[in-house]
């Protein structure tokens, strides 16, 4: 949601349809810390805060909830987890996309979907490719004590993961006084600018240049409980309630007490 709101200014002259997947990755029985992270990334906003924002701040000046976005974008906001089925493909195809922008879409899309938009499918990956492919790249970069972390904008040209031609990269310094989630959100500010640059080139009928990824790199999955403990014992944190509170206040113009953030409704 945050990334979409950041992109709205550059997309305002275009017809937009937003398709959502309900999860990213297939792992079940996740460590407790990752379940808590999922609450702060998804349930807190979508199930707890969004209804309150919608009810109390229908005219608020902050970023929009998905319900509010549904009312202002041409194609609305729709859940689409089965994009590779005939029914899902037909729904996707009905939006007649010229460009698909993928940000944490939790389904590996197949060639029939990839071939629809004439400007291709571009994906914003929260890691520097090819070094950090897979999920939670920012976590793994911090786990390895990297001093800089980044995002990669690349094409999706087949069903493989994080292997397409690279359009651009961005990076920021790591602040180990801040949480993993804080860094993910900070990266979206830089990453969405990469998308904006690409969209602007399309608007000007310019070619988006890209290059094949370098050889090497590693593919990462969700961390285990032991790996999360190592991360925490090194002085890092996954989530900071104070940071989340400040984020909501700053971008969604909604004041909420810390006690409300921790009520897993």
Residue ranges and their predicted role:
Residues 1-265:
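One-carbon transfer enzymes
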